C-alpha cells in the first residue's frame, strides 16, 4: 500500500550545485587556506544563514563591512556575485524530477533555504524550478 502523493526536492546541493568557492577561489588566486579563512570567519555559513532566514542582504553586508572594513570589496562580492555561486544543475536529479513531472502522479514541492532576495536569481536561471506546485522556504 503506497500512500505517497507528494515528493519534495531540495534545491541547493540536490538539484543545483551552489558554492561560494566559485567566486572566491579566483579572488584568492587559488589559495584555499585564505579563502577558507574568509568564508569561515568573515562571510561564514552562519552569517549567510541569517540572510537565508530573511535578514536584508544590504543591511547584513553593510554591518559586516563595518566590522571588517579591510575586506569591504570581498564582503560586497558575496551577494553582489551570488549568481556566480550557482554552479550546474545536477542533471540526474533534474531528469528524475522531470520523470515525476511527466507522470503527473505526485505533487512536486521544492525546498530551499535561499533568501527571498537571492531565490529569484536561481528561478530565472533554471527553468525546471517552475515545475513545482509549491516551494517551502
Question: What are the functions of these language-model segments?
Answer:
Residues 1-43:
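Active-site neighborhood of HAD-like aspartate-dependent phosphohydrolases
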Residues 113:
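Cofactor-binding loop segments of dinucleotide-utilizing enzymes, especially the Rossmann-like FAD-
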